[in-house]
Amino acid sequence: MRKLGRSTTIRCIVLGVLVLAATSCSQKHSSVAEQIAKTYGLDSFGQIDAIRYTFNLQFPGLNVSRSWVWEPKTGQVSYEGKDKDGKPVKATYVRSQLSSQSDAVKNDIDPGFINDNYWLLFPFHAYWDTSANVQDKGKQELPLGNGSAELVSVKYPSDVGYAPGDTWDLYVGKDNRIEQFVYHRGGPKKPSVVIATWEGYKKAGPLLISTDHRGTADGGPLRLFFSDVAVKLTGSDTWMNAQ
């Protein structure tokens, strides 16, 4: 695994906003995003006390693996990974107290958490992030392979978050599951365009999770997948593994 800072150009390709699950009373949720999020378990998300997962990225010359436990109700994040020398690194922090954390947490670990969490739970974030502009653009041809699907575009403001102006083009099937997506970076950093599948669907408790994404980043082969996915429900100490 490379040092977090050196892998920024790949692992921070989806940092659209800074605050997880934040909503604004002055802005309305997208009905299109809500319909998709409900397919992934939105109505049951309040039952989730903790989510555990390992983010794995394979790209030419780069292999990254990061493990997380996120407690949505408290905002606590626990991280396990390695530094540039391959030595284990662990950190636990509360996101509402991020300003009091070390530079390593603020500049490397938390941006990595946001990135990985968005990959895992983007159908929810597209609904939670009321600053995003969500548009249904009708049926379009899939970017990979044959067939067509409903194109739902999620564009973030140009002045918000780690990577402002990012756009996620979601190709949604009749069952409201995302089949593929095209990511367009709003800023100058690479990669500029990521095209990937949404596959390997599993249920983790009440949540539906896509655990495997295969495609390209600026034309180079990319695989991003999740392992050790599990959830812990309110009132239980037992992890429910995705299957």
Q: How does the language model describe each region?
A:
Residues 30-33, 39-43, 72, 86-90, ...:
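Intrinsically disordered terminal and processing segments
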